[in-house]
Amino acid sequence: MRCPFCGAPDTRVIDSRLAGEGDQVRRRRECLSCSERFTTYENAELNMPRVVKRDGSREPFNEDKLKSGMTHALEKRAVSTDKVEEAVARIKRKLLGQGEREVDSRRIGEWVMEELRNLDQVAYIRFASVYLSFADVQAFREVIERLEKDLTPEMRKHQIPLLGDEEGEGKD
């Protein structure tokens, strides 16, 4: 691999390890000319299915678009970039696991909502408000109430209530 510092054509690998939940290889390299070190990541090149949009149009799967949508919902929330990367990797594995050449965008949206629900309630609500196109405040409240009701004890430990506590505090 060419050195990004001096442009020399020869580098050597000094360390390799798995990264990204095992679907990436992280390599530390050293240039044989200038001795600078740098990191590279190796991913398998996979043929992702095409996405069928609501209007029937088709487009190639875009990981950056998926990550951007999730990151936007998680803006100013205490969720690490690593957690987002792991969620994106799980969604990609689901896409590949379908074994289909095309996948409906609604299915991807459902997987994103599932991942956000597990990461952060506020991000889930932010995404759902756009994805589900709430008609009114009542529809918004119903999704929040369903979300709070469906939380597992483990998830409840890591989240703050959206509508007050179990005793009805904060509810009118």
From Swiss-Prot:
According to the UniProt entry, its GO molecular function terms are: ATP binding; DNA binding; zinc ion binding
Which terms under GO biological process does the entry name? Answer: negative regulation of DNA-templated transcription
Domain of life the protein comes from: Bacteria
Zinc finger (unnamed) residue numbers:
3-34
Domain ATP-cone span(s) in chain numbering: 49-139
Task: Provide the cofactor list for this protein.
Answer: Zn(2+)
Where do the coiled-coil regions begin and end? none
Similarity remark? Belongs to the NrdR family.
Q: What does this protein do?
A: Negatively regulates transcription of bacterial ribonucleotide reductase nrd genes and operons by binding to NrdR-boxes.
Q: Could you identify this protein by its name?
A: Transcriptional repressor NrdR
From what organism does this protein derive? Thioalkalivibrio sulfidiphilus (strain HL-EbGR7)
Q: Which gene encodes it?
A: nrdR
